C-alpha cells in the first residue's frame, strides 16, 4: 500500500490546500463605555481614535470623538442617551464624520447625518462623501465677489447688496423678521431656477421647534422653492451634538455644489442656538469655560464654518489643486462656483455688543440689523439702515441698480437724522421739509409684504421714482398704491423697452424718459 503513495503528489495536494486557505481576518478596534451622561460618553480602549472620527455602537447609534485624553476618549452621541448603557461595546469606523450628498437630495428634509426626516424613503441616486469638517479654500483658490445674489427685497438689493460668495449676517431680536428675509431670498431664486441658472439653497434649522420647521417647509413647497432647496433640521428635541453639527452638514452640502461649478446659498438659522449647543457639549466634556461660560474656541467654531463660503477662481488648473479637496470630488471639480452664507444671530433686547453677536459681526462681510421698534411701526423688513452694511457694496450690484440706488442709503440715514430733529422744531426751511418728505416716501417704497420678492428690473424702476423726486405730488398714504399702478403700467406698456432693458443692467435716456412719463401719468390721479 505504501508503495502506491507518492511523496510529490502529497506535497502538491497539501500545497493546493494551503493556497486555498482564506487567511483574511477583519480587525475591529473596540472600546467599552465607562460613563454616559447628557449626550456624552466616555470610552476606554480606543487608543488610536482620531479627533472628529465617527464611532458606532452595536445598536446602530453613532457618536463623534471630541476629546482625546490619556486614559479615555470623550465622544458626543448622535442619538438618544437612554439607549446607551455603561459597559456597551463601541467600535471605530476609521472614517471622519461625513454626509453623502447628491442631486437627489433636492426637495428633501434631512438630519445632519443625511438621513431623511420627511417620510419619503431613502435618498437614492449617485451620492458623494463630503466631510462635515473641512478647511476653507485658501486665498489663491478664491476670486473677488462681483456677481449679485438678488434677494427680491428692495431695501436689501438697493442699500445692502449681497454678492455670490459673500457672508452676510442677519441679526436682530426674536420676532423681528430674520427668518422671513432668508425665506424670501430662497423663494426669489425660483426665477434663476426657471432660467436654467439655479442657485441651490440649503436651509439649516438649528434648535427650532419641529412645528416651525414643518411650517417653513410647507411655505417653500407652496412657492415652488423646494425644487432647488434642501432642508437640514436639528430640532430642539434632538441631542445637542446634532444641533452643533447641523451647520457643518449644511456647509458640506453647499460645498458639493460650489466645487462642481454651481452656485449655492446656505442659511444658518440660527448660530446663537449652535453656540449654546456647543457650550452644553463642552461643559459636559469638562472643557475650560470662558466668557458667558462659552468655551475658549467659540470664535474659531464660527470662523471656520463661515470661511467655507467662497467664490471659486475661474482657472481650472488652480481650482483642481484646491486644498483639502475630498477624494469623492477629485475628477469632477469645476470652476466658477460659489457658496453664499446667510448666518442668523438672535440678540437680547437689541444688544449687538454681546459676545456671540460681536464675534459673528467681525467674521462676516456685513450685517443686516433688524429692529423691534421699526417692526412694530409697520416698517417691514425692519432694517435699521444706519448700522446695516455690506462690505462688498456696489461690486455686487448690476450697473443700473448701482446708478439708481447709489445715494439711497445716505439719503435715508440723513432723513432719519432730520426727522429726529424736526420733532423739536415746528418751523422748517423748504429744503429740510423736502428732504423729510422724500425720505418718508422712500421709506414707504421700501416696505414690502412677506413672500412677495420683486424682480430686480421692477425694483430699479420704482426706486428711480423715489430717488429722483417723482413722488413729490403723491400723498404719503398713496405711495404703495402708486407703486402698484406704476409697475402694472410698465408691464402693460413698456415690458420690452424698459423692464427687459433694465434686467440687463442698462439704464439710458430712453429708459429714464419712459419711467418719468409713466410716473407722471400715474401720479396725475392723486392731484
UniProtKB/Swiss-Prot annotation:
It is a peripheral membrane protein. The record marks 388 as: Required for activity. ATP binds at residues 172-179. It is found in: Cell inner membrane. SUPFAM superfamilies: C-terminal domain of alpha and beta subunits of F1 ATP synthase, N-terminal domain of alpha and beta subunits of F1 ATP synthase, P-loop containing nucleoside triphosphate hydrolases. Its main location: membrane. Keywords: ATP synthesis, ATP-binding, Cell inner membrane, Cell membrane, CF(1), Hydrogen ion transport, Ion transport, Membrane, Nucleotide-binding, Translocase, Transport. One of its GO terms (molecular function) is ATP binding. Its EC number is 7.1.2.2. GO terms for biological process: proton motive force-driven ATP synthesis. NCBIfam families: atpA, PRK13343.1. Produces ATP from ADP in the presence of a proton gradient across the membrane. The alpha chain is a regulatory subunit. This is ATP synthase subunit alpha.
